[in-house]
């Protein structure tokens, strides 16, 4: 079993357990056990803390496998045990606080202005998470200093310990971010990856961001209307969270097919400015820093991977360049799911147990 397939198994199992748990919770009428609209604030807060505590405990073995055990088993870069535990605890605490504040804000809006107001708050939180992923990622994980790359105007280099950290595009202005380690890994070819990121930093980035937000808000709106759903209490919101987790699972199956063309479009844009062999070399180097899986079976890629395999990307470098495509929508939607108790945001194969990747998931 390769490192990539071992991680995939962890992700499939973790996601599967949360999907089964959500179905069981709804089928057993679990929301009725939690405080309803007439409960006091202290009862609501205690119930919310209990829900989040269960989330942390059930996630723990998959976090340990994905973030510590598998990297060490396969000789990947990994902090020592104490450093990992401290980093994991910090990430879990920040995520739990963020999810709790989001739930309380939605319930407050729902009580004050009804369902419409609650959905508006959900939309605001989802967009805030989307555009503020870099500062949120810094709160979740102990990312090192950032600095502007003197050789590439507008590019921010970020120190990170996880080799899976890729930076991305974030912020209102579509700021391009990359791990500082890539300056050594790519050398002069870093300019090729800079060209790729700049190609998606405008309309493709915003199209992907808005698509992720629309998927998130639409899913929450549907979940509120389903049995047990509502925005007046923690019990109702827990039901919404369970339904929304099932919606997020559907997103894991649907959104990668929307995201893959965006990767191909960025590759093709870089191949217009640079020789195809240089673009191919960058793709291979960066794939090696990730899961080192240059080739995948079609069914594995279609179902589980929003970023095509290195071999598939290289085979599609020839012009013509595709038109406008949304970029990174599948993986931008995952941290947005924090806005309504989405349980899959850090359970997928690429970021399970890796706090540096919980908000800024691996990008192409």
Spans of features found by a protein language model:
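Polar-ligand-bearing catalytic/cofactor-coordination segments
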Residues: 1-231, 254-342, 356-364
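Flexible internal linker/loop segments at domain or repeat junctions
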Residues: 222-241, 247
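Hydrophobic alpha-helical transmembrane segments of polytopic membrane proteins
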Residues: 241, 245-257
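Blade-level signature of beta-propeller repeat domains, shared across WD40, Kelch, NHL, RCC1
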Residues: 352-353
């Amino acid at each position: 079993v390769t490192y990539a397939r071992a991680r995939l198994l962890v992700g499939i199992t973790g996601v599967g357990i949360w999907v089964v748990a959500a179905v069981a919770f709804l089928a057993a009428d679990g929301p009725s056990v939690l405080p309803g609209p007439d409960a006091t604030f202290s009862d609501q807060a205690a119930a919310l803390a209990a829900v989040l505590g269960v989330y942390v405990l059930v996630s723990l073995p998959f976090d340990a496998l994905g973030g510590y055990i598998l990297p060490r088993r396969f000789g990947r870069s990994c902090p020592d045990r104490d450093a990992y535990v401290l980093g994991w605890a910090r990430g879990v605490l920040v995520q739990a606080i963020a999810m709790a504040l989001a739930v309380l804000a939605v319930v407050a809006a729902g009580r004050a202005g009804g369902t419409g107001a609650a959905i508006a708050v959900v939309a605001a939180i989802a967009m805030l998470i989307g555009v503020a992923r870099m500062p949120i990622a810094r709160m979740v994980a102990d990312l090192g200093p950032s600095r502007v790359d003197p050789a590439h105007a507008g590019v921010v280099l970020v120190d990170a310990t996880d080799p899976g950290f890729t930076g991305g595009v974030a912020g209102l202005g579509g700021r391009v971010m990359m791990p500082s380690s890539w300056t050594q890994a790519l050398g002069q070819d870093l300019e090729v990856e800079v060209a790729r990121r700049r190609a998606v930093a405008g309309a493709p980035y915003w199209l992907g961001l808005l698509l992720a937000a629309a998927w998130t808000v639409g899913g929450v709106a549907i979940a509120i209307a389903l049995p047990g759903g509502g925005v007046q209490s923690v019990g109702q919101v827990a039901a919404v969270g369970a339904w929304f987790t099932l919606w997020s699972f559907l997103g894991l199956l649907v959104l990668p097919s929307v995201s893959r063309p965006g990767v191909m479009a960025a590759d093709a844009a870089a191949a217009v400015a640079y020789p195809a062999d240089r673009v191919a070399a960058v793709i291979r180097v960066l794939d090696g820093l990730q899961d080192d899986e240059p080739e995948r079976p079609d069914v594995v890629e279609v179902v589980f991977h929003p970023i095509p395999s290195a071999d598939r990307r290289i085979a599609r470098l020839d012009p013509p360049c595709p038109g406008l495509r949304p970029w990174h929508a599948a993986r931008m939607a995952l941290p947005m799911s924090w806005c309504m108790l989405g349980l899959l945001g850090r359970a997928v194969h690429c970021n399970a147990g890796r706090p540096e990747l919980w908000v800024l998931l691996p990008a192409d």
